[in-house]
């Protein structure tokens, strides 16, 4: 005899479940997304247009080839500059019927006027295979050989996990320059957001941290604020694990940040993902950043972030005024009244 007992959670959040037989738990999942209506195509809401795949060859990364897509909402008008949002691991966000129905959310929130009309750039990590002998190739190949990682995976880590301004310069000077030659995009960071998952999460935070004049709004899912590229390049002293201290001790950046993670995220030789995200959130709170931490019990998965993406976007773009080019981001008054984050051991 099989039976199930379920507690129905709200839409826009992930569900978890398990099976129990003779008093013993087995199977199940922490990450079953429960998409709300804003994650589905709605009657009467116009759909934007996703471009064909575009290939870019980088100078900053010595011939690395990247692919990206441009999403243009139906409301875009060439004579009105649009806001901008850049998605790392971009191909993961482009399927309306997939695990990350991002395009549906963007269409619906623009129609509801919860976010501005925005051009979205979905960019994948690059491939250095065709540029042997270049400094970038040699570094990436050496890193991959050292840690038994593929050339493509090592290129992604070099792009995303390195704590420097190189990647955001690549976006600014190469990719977004191409996009801006085709579409009317706002140049003020007040109108620019960036997001990613895992290493793409720290990459997005790092881009805004390094150049807050380019991006001021950040969403990080299961961000890898860890030591993945720490000391791999002797010229770069910091690793991702250093960001809590950088936030506490360096000049405050005018950025707005949403962090998402779960208690069952990774704990490996590079570090502990839940603790790293909690440490960063605590640092942001102490410095009174405009931030939000959404912390559940999920794993290293997009389920939590994707399920609440409408909420994330609404929060990220709240009080946006297209007549402005700047805003001094301040911590939400409700967050100021809340205590700092505490940690408890739950598995032993």
Where do the PLM segments sit?
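Non-catalytic cap/lid and distal C-terminal segments of serine-dependent acyl enzymes
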Residues: 1-348
């Amino acid at each position: 005899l099989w039976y199930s007992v379920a507690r129905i959670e709200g839409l826009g959040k992930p569900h978890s479940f398990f099976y129990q037989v003779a008093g013993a738990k087995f199977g199940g999942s922490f990450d079953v997304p429960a998409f709300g209506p804003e994650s589905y195509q709605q009657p009467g809401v116009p759909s934007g247009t996703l471009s064909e795949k575009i290939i870019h060859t980088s100078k900053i990364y010595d011939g690395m080839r990247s692919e990206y897509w441009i999403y243009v909402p139906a409301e875009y008008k060439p004579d009105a500059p649009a806001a901008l949002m850049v998605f790392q691991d971009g191909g993961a966000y482009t399927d309306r019927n997939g695990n990350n129905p991002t395009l549906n959310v963007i269409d619906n929130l623009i129609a509801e006027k919860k976010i501005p009309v925005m051009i979205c750039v979905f960019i994948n990590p690059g491939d250095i295979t065709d540029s042997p002998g270049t400094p970038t190739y040699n570094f990436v190949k050496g890193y991959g050989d050292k840690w038994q990682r593929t050339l493509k995976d090592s290129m992604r880590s070099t792009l995303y996990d390195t704590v420097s301004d190189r990647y955001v310069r690549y976006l600014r000077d190469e990719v977004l320059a191409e996009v801006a030659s085709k579409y009317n995009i706002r140049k003020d960071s007040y109108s620019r957001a960036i997001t990613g998952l895992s290493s793409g999460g720290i990459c997005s935070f790092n881009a805004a941290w390094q150049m807050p004049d380019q991006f001021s709004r950040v969403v990080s899912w299961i961000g890898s604020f860890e030591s993945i590229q720490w000391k791999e390049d002797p010229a770069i002293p910091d690793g991702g694990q250093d960001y809590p201290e950088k936030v506490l001790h360096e000049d405050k950046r005018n950025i707005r940040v949403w962090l998402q993670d779960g208690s069952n995220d990774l704990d490996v030789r590079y570090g502990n993902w839940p603790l790293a995200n909690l440490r960063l959130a605590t640092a942001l709170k102490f410095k009174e950043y405009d931030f939000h931490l959404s912390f559940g019990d999920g794993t290293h998965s997009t389920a939590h972030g994707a399920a609440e993406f409408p909420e994330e976007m609404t929060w990220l773009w709240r009080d946006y005024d297209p007549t402005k080019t700047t805003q001094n981001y301040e911590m939400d008054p409700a967050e100021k009244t809340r205590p700092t984050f505490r940690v408890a051991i739950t598995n032993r």
